[in-house]
Amino acid sequence: VIRERVLLADNHQNMLAGVRTLLESMFEKVFMVADEASLLEAAEKIKPDLIIADLSLPVTMEINIARRLYNTFPDIKLIILSVHDDSIAISECMEAGAKGFVLKRTAVNDLVPAIEAVLHDASYISPAALVKPESKALYMKNSAS
């Protein structure tokens, strides 16, 4: 067990179930929510070590969730899960305070390295999202900071 508490926010039950099994082997307590309001409430209540949140949670203004989480809970590390692999989404999430960006289609391979990197104060972007030159430049910028 690496840490005590992780909070997973995703409105897709299959994703929650698959990721939960993985997280239970890495954390003492795994909490799950399915929307932005529940995420913010749970983060306030349980103060997790890590939040893994779907970029497209219901009632979310997408990027705003990363910014809101970072502004409200700057000490909680954040990894964004997303189906979007465009450099603008990645850049906006990372600039908003996320430390990791994992594509849902590669999460089975990328989530553990992302968690390990982020918990050790490094950043992580799914390698499959880095095939575009502008995404590679973004990764280099975030790795240097």
PLM region spans:
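Short hydrophobic/Thr-rich beta-strand motif most characteristic of the beta2 strand and flanking loop
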Residues: L7, F27-A37, A42
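Short amphipathic alpha-helix used as the core "switch/output" element in two-component signaling
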Residues: I63-D75
